[in-house]
Amino acid sequence: GNISGSNSSVDYSLQEYANDVVMALKNVCDESGLPHPHIISESGRALVAHHAVMIVDVVDITRRINDTAPKEPDADSPVQLRQLWDTLSEFDALQAREALHDVTAYREDINKLFVLGHATLSDRAHADDLYWRIISKIMTAMDESELSQLEPGLNSKMADRYFCNFSVFQSLPDSWAINQVFPVMPIHRLNEEPDRQAILVDITCDSDGKIEDFPLQNGISPTLPLHTERSGESYLLGIFLTGAYQEILGDLHNLFGDTHAVHVRMDGDHYELEQVVAGESVAEVLDYVQFHEKVLLDRMRRQLQEARLQGRISAREANRFLRCYQEGLQGYTYLEDESPGAV
């Protein structure tokens, strides 16, 4: 831990912990005139958490503010949308605190107009874009402590979303279930200072499928420092201390199965890859919920045969589609570099 008062850390040493346990037992035995016992303890998580690390690849990134120039609203746009534009355009002449109050009200008004049918979805999206651009300027102009009092959690709301190729519910269930905090960091580009603040999002459809508490040097942070992506390069993150039951506790939410695993044996400064265990296939996971591969393939063959007899597809197209479908069933439940049937 980071020796703090956080629920996910400790502010005492291992020796202090041992002294207190031994002292408590010693005092009870002395008071009762009993011999001192041999003490055997089992500190599960502390013993086994270190034996596993989860490696995830970042598959996409979204940001509150994109690289394009802001667009001026049309003349017939809702007045609140025009006011957001005016605030952005004239920001340097405004008080940051006043601007924060104003743009929050304008955005809320646009959302209400949308619910009532007096603003379009495009208006609402445009308002959000202008709002976050103004918030970015406000965060630069205002003192961080003052801003956190006026609008708590802005750093987290402004953070990038790094979408990672995993399921929180399968691979880090304690992060979701009991708010367990896991150390996370990039496993390469370690000689470069991170220049983005991010939260991690998995590829399930669940809004809880994210990590937004990270143990950093000064305590628990709602964001994680990461690097800007590079075109054509992978970006891998290590999630550490996952050896304490995460694989056993994981579930099949959204039908994401067990991940690939590599067993590594350490020998001094050397290591050996003892075993590579393939993750579950789509067919294996579907079998858990009573959708059997043979039945699915037979059903698809009948549908393709019917389509071919009706002249909707050719025999070659039917064979190619069936081959692609079969490869998909045998494929990984997570995103892969190549789609089934890719040529």
PLM features per residue range, with description:
Residues 2, 13, 22, 34-35:
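Gly/Pro-rich turn-and-neighbor structural signature
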Residues 2-15, 62-64:
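Glycine-rich tight-turn/loop motif centered on a GG-T
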Residues 8-17, 75-78, 281:
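Secondary-structure junction/capping motif
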Residues 14-29:
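Alpha-helix-loop-beta-strand connector modules within alpha/beta enzyme cores
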Residues 29, 34, 38, 43-343:
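Charged (often Lys/Glu-rich) extended helix/loop segments that serve as interaction or gating elements
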